[in-house]
């Protein structure tokens, strides 16, 4: 009987371990400092939650702890696009970018204005703009048919135009083909191949704008330095 109780106790212990979700196991690995194991589970979880900013955030944390600042910045940036108001995501993205000599807030832009510009996610702003459009259409119909509500219709029209302008600028930022240097150093060459001379070297964590591609090379612009050239695809991570 005693042996039966011991066996049941052991089985219950194994059951509790296997009952943990991959996310819980990832968190446990992370707390234990097993960042590579945690990363594998977070990336597995990403397959079923591809638009979860906190999964990207946790992946970024793992890469940050492993010293891969470029890949950390790429994943923090993906999280930032989905949840721009989250303070932890914003702070960690700024920290990862600063390690590579970059800044989240462009030079000359007040931080308050930058936060206001990203106070809504792209999908939230798109939804707000669509709602304002339909409200304006409804009020405009009422004004045309009954000649009532002209003032509020004009007010909504102004708010809609402001929202539409904001959305247009966010759309340009959202669709900008960004990448980050993931390798310790990326060589910027004058053409798409190792036979072309290197004009500059860029450390990991620097932000790039992808302009074109040919074979295994991307034509890029280093945003903070204005340098243009070709870089090996394996040296960067697209965001």
Q: What are these regions, as identified by a protein language model?
A:
Residues 69, 143-200, 209, 221-239:
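Boundary regions of SH3-family modules and the immediately adjacent low-complexity/disordered segments
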Residues 102-145:
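Membrane-embedded alpha-helical segments of integral membrane proteins
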């Amino acid at each position: 009987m005693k042996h039966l109780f011991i066996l049941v106790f052991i089985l219950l212990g194994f059951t509790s371990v296997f009952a943990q979700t991959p996310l819980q196991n990832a968190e446990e690995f992370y707390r234990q400092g097993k960042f590579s194991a945690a990363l594998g589970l977070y990336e597995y979880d990403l397959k079923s939650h591809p638009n979860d900013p906190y999964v990207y955030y946790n992946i970024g944390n793992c890469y940050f702890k492993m010293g891969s600042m470029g890949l950390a910045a790429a994943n923090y940036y993906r999280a930032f696009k989905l949840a721009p108001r989250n303070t932890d995501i914003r702070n960690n993205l700024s920290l990862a970018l600063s390690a590579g000599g970059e800044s989240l807030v462009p030079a000359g832009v007040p931080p308050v204005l930058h936060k206001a510009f990203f106070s809504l996610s792209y999908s939230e702003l798109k939804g707000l703009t669509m709602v304002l459009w339909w409200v304006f259409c409804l009020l405009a119909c009422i004004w045309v048919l009954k000649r009532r509500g002209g003032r509020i219709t004009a007010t909504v029209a102004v708010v809609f135009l402001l929202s539409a302008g904001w959305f247009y600028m966010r759309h340009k930022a959202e669709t900008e083909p960004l990448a980050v240097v993931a390798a310790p150093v990326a060589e910027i060459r004058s053409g798409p191949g190792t036979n072309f001379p290197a004009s500059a070297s860029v450390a990991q964590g620097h932000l790039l704008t992808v302009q074109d591609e040919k074979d295994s090379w991307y034509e890029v612009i280093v945003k903070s330095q204005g340098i243009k050239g070709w870089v090996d695809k394996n040296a960067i991570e697209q965001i």
